[in-house]
UniProtKB/Swiss-Prot annotation:
Residues 30-59 are annotated as: NMP. This is Adenylate kinase. AMP binds at T31, R36, Q57, L58, V59, G85, F86, P87, R88, Q92, R156, R167. Catalyzes the reversible transfer of the terminal phosphate group between ATP and AMP. Plays an important role in cellular energy homeostasis and in adenine nucleotide metabolism. It comes from Psychromonas ingrahamii (strain DSM 17664 / CCUG 51855 / 37). Its EC number is 2.7.4.3. GO terms for molecular function: adenylate kinase activity; ATP binding. Monomer. It catalyses: AMP + ATP = 2 ADP. GO terms for biological process: AMP salvage.
Amino acid sequence: MRIILLGAPGAGKGTQAQFMMDKYGIPQISTGDMLRAAAKAGTELGLKAKELMDAGQLVSDELIIDLVKERISAEDCAKGFLLDGFPRTIPQADAMKTAGVAVDFVLEFDVPDEEIVKRMAGRRVHAGSGRTYHIVYNPPKVADKDDVTGDDLSIRPDDEESTVRKRLDIYHTQTEPLVAYYKNEAGQGNGEYHKFDGTKTVDVISAELATVLG
């Protein structure tokens, strides 16, 4: 069961990835984690990647594809894997296909931009403990104060509205074209493409996923 997850930041991919990992016993592969692990393991590819990252340079698509191939040949990927955050662009998707990395399911989580802004801009965090709140979905007992300590809550820079909108713009420009790409692939019999309404409750989406994936 080889799965690619698509969806804007804040669309709920992480929550559903956890559900699929637990249910199907497959690992989630995020390129960031993979690059760090390969660099730490000191493999030839990992050392190449580390050299580039240490110099503040982008790791090439070719090198990432090689790392993906190396990672998915590991024992824990025998039943399959979840790719999150890769591919991000059409050239990366093409390179993956050329490298012979087949995919069974592409799952898109669709949430309108304004809902994502509301989700992320409403998050509040207690710096000392990492406790998180949401002004709409999980508000603190006293506005902007931590329930336990009474300390002020803060907004993470990543959750600032301007940052969220920038990330959404990048997603729409770079990654959204993959939706059409993978729909086309599915039309040619290369895997299945499924779109989920990310505004539904977590349990409903999980149940829909289980129906699709079996």
